[in-house]
Amino acid sequence: MAMSDRDDMSGLEVFFDAARAHAAEPSVALMARIEADAQAVAAQTSAPPRPRRASLSSQLYRLLGGWPAVTGLATAAMAGVWLGISLPEGMLDGANESAYLIDVAPELAFDLAGGNF
Amino acid sequence: MPFDAMAEMSDETLLVLFANGDGAAARALNLRLTPRVMGHAYRLLGNHAEAEDVTQEAMLRLWKIAPEWRQDEAKVTTWLYRVVANLCIDLRRRARGVALESIPEPEDGRATAAEILQDAARAEALQEALDQLPDRQRQAVVLRHIEGLANPEIAEIMEITTEAVESLTARGKRALTAALSGRQEELGYGDER
């Protein structure tokens, strides 16, 4: 730097002092506008969030009775699927066919076999 | 919280209180910060109406950022000086692009200097000289010699090194000295050297 800070300031300091003493001041109207802005922003940020509309699945969930009912339904559904896909071997193994076949009209069967219409 | 109790609180604490819904904290911050913001904006712009617009916008941004403010992050004033400078630079760039011819010539103070206080005339003369400086030089000189900030804080505001701050202020002051040297007698500048 060609000049020292002291040299630079020898004449400028009186101007800087004058500038500090004659600072531009905000008008009353500006202060009021800024205050109003603050209130508007505060009202925006502190407003409670609007309740969101529940989705269809959550409405159905509540309609069914919440988690206890849904758990029961899910268990029953899984049991049904399991019974449907597994072969009923235990029920048939070694059983006599006549034990579970019921002839509701034996006379009709006889008539058919005899060919007597 | 009572308004009087806020006098001792830092700007950062008041901003957090405002974010938590304390209206008195907003009033305290408005009274404390708006005059500083306005003074700084005017020194950077040299236009009262524009300085008011910039001040309102800077304060609005402060209210909006309050919920995200982290107390350990930065000083509120450092943040505000940076926002004000950016807004002023944007405004001056836009004005320069629109109509240079429409900017009025600085008034010749020689005819009126005797009628007004010498101190006010000096402030006005300095403002005219500041208006002629490049944006960054003006900002550095104002922050250092009128706002009275230390170079490290100015470096933080301007996002440059302290060496760059020193260089900007030195060049700015040389330009101011040259601009004001022709008005020594008129402004009583020579009497106090």
Where are these regions (language model features)?
Chain B
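Short helix-capping/turn signature of helix-turn-helix
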Residues: 32-35, 44, 142-149
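C-terminal edge and immediately downstream basic/flexible tail or linker adjoining helix-turn-helix-like DNA-binding
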Residues: 1-5, 17, 156-162, 173-193
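Structural recognition of an alpha-helix C-terminal capping motif at a helix-to-coil junction
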Residues: 39, 53-60, 74-86
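Helix-turn-helix DNA-binding module
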Residues: 128-139, 147-164
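Internal acidic/polar
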Residues: 7-11, 97-123, 150, 190
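A short, charge-rich alpha-helical start-of-domain segment used by transcription regulators
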Residues: 16-39, 128
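Arg/Lys-rich amphipathic alpha helix in sigma70-family domain 2
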Residues: 64-71, 82-101, 119
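Sigma70-family region 2
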Residues: 19-20, 46, 57-74, 94-96
